[in-house]
Every structure is written in C-alpha cells, then in structure tokens.
C-alpha cells in the first residue's frame, strides 16, 4: 500500500510538472482533459450548430464553458456555486482597463495556452475541496488524482463548518478595515492581472500602484490535520477574533507571499528579513539563491569590500542575520502580524535598498586604494564562490570590518565602556561643553604621542592651577596603545591647565597633532560616517531614521542622503 501511494504521488508530481511545462493549446478537448486531471466531473452538450458547452463540476463549483465552433474560440465562461453563498468575485481589473472583466474568460481568450486557466482552476478546486458546508452529509470523494485533497475530506467527524468561498470574499473587506483603523496607507484589491488573490498595494514614486504582497489560501503540506479557523476583524475590539470554534477546516493555511521576492530577476530588489525578528513557525518558504546571484544581501556585501562612495564611511551595526522569505503563514491569530510584515517590506524598499543604491559605486570609483581591509571578511562577494558558505548573511563581526570602519570604531569606541554603541549625541554634548572634537576620557586615557628620540614617555604627575569645569584632575600615564589613531591637539587641552613632559620648554606646549596611522586618510570634514543596522540608520550628526518612524520620515532621510552623496 505504501509503495502504491508513493507511486501515485510521484505520478501526480510528474503530471503537475508536465502541465506547467507544456500546458497545451486552448481547445475544448484540452480543457476537458485538464478538468479530468483534477478529478472534476465533465460533460459536453450541443446548444446549437455553432455553440458547444462544456460543464465541469465538483462539490460546490460548477463551471460552464461556451465554445463557438464556427469562430474556433471560447465565447463565454460562467461560475456558479452550489451553496447558500453565490457572490464569489471572479472578476478583476486588468492593467490599462477601466472595467472589471471575467478572470476565467480572460484566461481562455487572452493567453496563448492553458497555463493561466489551469492555475485559476486549481485555486477554485482548492476552495471547493476544503470547504465544508451544512449540505455536506458525507465525505466527498470525486476521484481526484490529488490524494491529499481526498484525504482531507475522509473523516467528517473531525471537520468543522467553513465555506471558504464566502470567507475569502469577506477577508478582503476585513483586511481593508484593519488597515483603516490602524492608519496603514495600503490599498487592498481582490484579484489582479487575471489571478485570484487579495493583493496589498502601495503608491509608487511615479504615482502607480506597486504590489507588495499577495494573500491566498494554500494546502498545508506539512500538517494535513492543521486547523484553519475563521478569524474575522472586529471593529469593536480592533483585533482579529474567532467567533465560533466550530468554524474551521483541516489541512489548509492562509499565506502571504511577498511579491517582490517572487521575482528574482533583480536580486538587489529582494526583501531581506531579520531572522531574529521572525518566528520560524511563520516561515513557509524561503527564496533560494540562483547561481548567478549573491547569497548575501547587497547592503551587507558593502561591509566586506571597499566598493562604496568615497564620501561615506560605513559602520556595521547589524545584530542579526538577514534572510529571504517568500511566504508567511498568517493563518488564525497570525493575521495580527500583517501590518508588521508590511512595515518591514516598506522599510526595506524605501530605506535599505535606496541606501545601498546611493552608497554603491563602480569599482573604478571605489575608495579601496586608500582604505585597505584589516581582515578578509568571512563571506563571499558576488565575484567569488556564491555557494561556499550558508552563513553569508551573518552580521559581520566588528573586528572584521575594513580599515576605514575599524579606525572609526577605535575613535568612537575608545571609552571605558567598550560595549557601548557609538552615539551621535556624544559629539553634541562635547560641543556644548567646549570640547569640539574629542572626549575627555579619550584624551586622558589613551594618548599617543610620537617622540623624536623614540623613548617612551615617563610617568609624571601634572599640577593644575584650578579644577576644570567637569571636576577632573588632569593626569597623563604611560599607556602604550599602538592601535590608536588619536593624538592630542593644543585645543584639546582645557584652558587653565599646565602640563610638563620631562624637560619640555614653553615653546613645546603646543603639541601638533600627528596621524600615526600607516594609511592615508581624507579630511574628516569630507567623509561622513554612516551607521547601518537592520532597523536604524544614522548619517553622522546630520540625520537619522529607524523602522518605527513614519514613512514620511524615511523619505525625507533618503532625499537628504541623496543630496549629500550625489
């Protein structure tokens, strides 16, 4: 029995692959055979000398296809539901058209083969097979070759009542109301471009609608007994609720597919999600990397090489791995997460992708000649082996950054609190206190003074005429730090203090700042520090934005950033 089941499953897979590979031309005979492969009952009747009608039916759906023999084309297609609900929307508005049109008819008249009709017919049959209405008295076995659909209807004692045609039609209204109550600027459309589904769209830069995600029902391949409940949006509680525990169906899930991640032609436009932010139970399908695509996010690749705008100094602040996710399971109470997932999709599209495009430069214009990496990053770039490691999207260790970022990190992170993240507020506070460039702790704890004779500086106590404003007593100790790049300037010493270094004269009081780094550097005024993480971006002391800001704040940040780097 097991061998027989395995044979049938393999045969079904081969049939599905063949139908996708060579769907066949649009004829009445081919449509009849296609319906039979799904287990639909079909028969043909002659309405006149010129018109034939193919009627195909299952438990709920009845589809009539009128074929004009004289003109050799499909003339009309109608869908009727054998249930109390007969208001299922099988119309849509095609691009460039103002009126809604019949999806099933378009599938058979506007395409060269049966592929579009086959996909739409499979969706209708899925809703039919997993719907359980009151008129069902026994399990329905229509002889389908899809064994999973038959097995889902095999035990009626473990089934609830749920009309998926009715629920799917009402779901779009619930989602639209949810967005309205939560002030989410998204548009909801039922069916798009002759495909069934609930589409979430947003306004693009050129004013056109851009699809972000598609919501539809799909067979749960991992758990045939998974219970899908009828969750609706309540305007009173402003949340998704299940009013009846008896309204459910087994073996089906509600899926949200990221439309951008369904198109792998432009790899830089994929949406990358933070792994630690998402529960594994939500992930149905990840995007697999093609052989000619990098397996790490483009914005992460910038940290492993120096191919970026010379006016920008990148600092990596990512704390989690970024992964591609194609489909999310939003069944039942997971419907609450739709807004959060879409928020990240918007953040990735508007901010992360645009930052990458603005910072990226051709290799000939990169700053790699001046800023050599201190350490080779442990993941490959697009010109190396794409499949050498599965950890390519791991956040880059801070010690593995290229030279410019490491040097900046030393300057910014030389305080006693080594785990402290660099903050742009520190520079503002020091300006208010009269210290324009350096932190007092950095000046006192990690000086690096180059002596002509090469001898180390001897430890001396320093006397002061009076206490400084911050209440510190200045002292210089013999601390050797070969990695530091900071040397004191004359304006870095507080007024009212005097320091004696060995037998230095008064003329030596003004200590000239020297760059002890072996690497040439550009003036700091012309290089802006850009701190990038999965949920926030800081552009020096000029501007910043984060995931939780309004979309308008993101757009303003990108506009300002574009003006600076262009």
Curated annotation (Swiss-Prot):
Which residue ranges are recorded for the region named Disordered? Answer: 361-425
One record GO biological process: positive regulation of transcription elongation by RNA polymerase II
Quote the cellular component terms of the Gene Ontology held in the record. Answer: core mediator complex; mediator complex; nucleus
Q: Which residues carry this modification: Phosphoserine?
A: 155, 423
Compartments where found: Nucleus
Q: Where are the transmembrane segments?
A: none
Query: InterPro entries from the xrefs?
Result: Mediator_Med1
What are the Basic residues biased-composition ranges?
A: 410-421
Question: In Gene Ontology terms, what is one molecular function of this protein?
Answer: transcription coregulator activity
Keyword vocabulary terms for this entry: Activator, Nucleus, Phosphoprotein, Transcription, Transcription regulation
State where it is primarily located. nucleus
Known role? Component of the Mediator complex, a coactivator involved in the regulated transcription of nearly all RNA polymerase II-dependent genes. Mediator functions as a bridge to convey information from gene-specific regulatory proteins to the basal RNA polymerase II transcription machinery. The Mediator complex, having a compact conformation in its free form, is recruited to promoters by direct interactions with regulatory proteins and serves for the assembly of a functional preinitiation complex with RNA polymerase II and the general transcription factors.
- Recite the other comments: Present with 4675 molecules/cell in log phase SD medium.
Report quaternary structure and partners: Component of the Mediator complex, which is composed of at least 21 subunits that form three structurally distinct submodules. The Mediator head module contains MED6, MED8, MED11, SRB4/MED17, SRB5/MED18, ROX3/MED19, SRB2/MED20 and SRB6/MED22, the middle module contains MED1, MED4, NUT1/MED5, MED7, CSE2/MED9, NUT2/MED10, SRB7/MED21 and SOH1/MED31, and the tail module contains MED2, PGD1/MED3, RGR1/MED14, GAL11/MED15 and SIN4/MED16. The head and the middle modules interact directly with RNA polymerase II, whereas the elongated tail module interacts with gene-specific regulatory proteins.
What family does the entry list?
A: Belongs to the Mediator complex subunit 1 family.
The identity of this protein, by name, is: Mediator of RNA polymerase II transcription subunit 1
Q: Record the organism.
A: Saccharomyces cerevisiae (strain ATCC 204508 / S288c) (Baker's yeast)
Q: What lineage does UniProt assign to this protein's organism?
A: Eukaryota, Fungi, Dikarya, Ascomycota, Saccharomycotina
């Amino acid at each position: 029995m097991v061998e027989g089941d395995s044979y049938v499953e393999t045969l079904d897979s081969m049939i599905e692959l063949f139908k996708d590979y060579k769907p066949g031309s649009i004829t009445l005979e081919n449509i009849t055979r296609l319906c039979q492969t799904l287990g639909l009952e079909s028969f043909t009747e002659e309405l006149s000398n010129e018109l034939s009608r193919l009627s195909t039916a299952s438990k709920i759906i009845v589809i009539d296809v009128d074929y004009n023999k004289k003109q050799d084309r499909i003339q009309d297609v109608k869908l009727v539901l054998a249930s109390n609900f007969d208001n299922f929307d099988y119309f849509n508005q095609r691009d460039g058209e103002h009126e809604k049109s019949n999806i099933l008819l378009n599938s058979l008249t506007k395409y060269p083969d049966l592929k579009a009709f086959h996909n739409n017919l499979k969706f209708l049959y899925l809703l039919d097979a997993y719907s359980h209405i009151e008129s069902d008295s026994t399990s329905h076995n229509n002889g389908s070759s899809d064994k999973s659909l038959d097995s889902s209807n095999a035990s009626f004692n473990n089934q609830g009542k749920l009309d998926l045609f009715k629920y799917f039609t009402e779901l779009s209204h619930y989602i639209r109301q949810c967005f309205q109550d939560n002030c989410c600027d998204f548009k909801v459309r039922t069916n798009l471009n002759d495909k069934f589904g609930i589409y979430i769209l947003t306004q693009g830069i050129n004013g056109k609608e851009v699809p972000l995600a598609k919501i539809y029902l799909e067979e749960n391949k991992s758990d045939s007994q998974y219970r899908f409940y009828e969750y609706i949006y309540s305007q009173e509680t402003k949340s998704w609720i299940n009013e009846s525990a008896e309204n459910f169906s087994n073996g089906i899930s509600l899926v949200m597919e990221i439309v951008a991640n369904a198109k792998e032609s432009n790899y830089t436009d994929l949406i990358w999600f933070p792994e630690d932010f998402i529960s594994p139970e939500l992930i149905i399908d990840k995007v697999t990397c093609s052989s000619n695509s990098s397996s790490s996010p483009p914005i992460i690749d910038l940290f492993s090489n120096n191919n970026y705008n010379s006016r920008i100094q990148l600092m990596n602040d990512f704390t989690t791995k970024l992964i591609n996710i194609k489909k999310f399971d939003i069944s039942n109470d997971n419907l609450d997460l739709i807004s959060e997932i879409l928020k990240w999709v918007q953040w990735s599209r508007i901010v992360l992708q645009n930052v990458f495009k603005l910072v990226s430069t051709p290799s000939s214009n990169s700053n790699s000649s001046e800023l050599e990496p201190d350490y080779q990053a442990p993941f490959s770039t697009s010109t190396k082996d794409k499949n050498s490691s599965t950890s390519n999207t791991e956040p880059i260790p801070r010690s593995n950054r290229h030279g410019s970022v490491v040097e900046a990190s030393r300057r910014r992170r030389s305080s006693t609190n080594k785990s402290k993240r660099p903050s742009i507020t520190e520079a503002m506070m020091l300006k208010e206190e009269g210290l324009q460039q350096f932190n007092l702790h950095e000046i006192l704890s990690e000086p690096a003074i180059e002596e002509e004779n090469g001898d180390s500086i001897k430890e001396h106590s320093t006397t002061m005429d009076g206490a400084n404003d911050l209440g510190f007593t200045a002292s210089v100790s013999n601390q050797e730090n070969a990695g530091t790049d900071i040397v004191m300037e004359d304006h870095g010493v507080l007024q009212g203090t005097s320091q004696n270094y060995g037998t230095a004269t008064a003329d030596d009081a003004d200590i000239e700042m020297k760059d002890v780094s072996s690497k040439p550097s550009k003036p700091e005024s012309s290089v802006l520090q850009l701190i990038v993480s999965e949920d926030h971006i800081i552009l020096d002391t000029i501007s910043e934005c984060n995931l939780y800001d309004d979309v308008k704040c993101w757009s303003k940040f990108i506009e300002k950033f574009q003006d600076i780097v262009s």
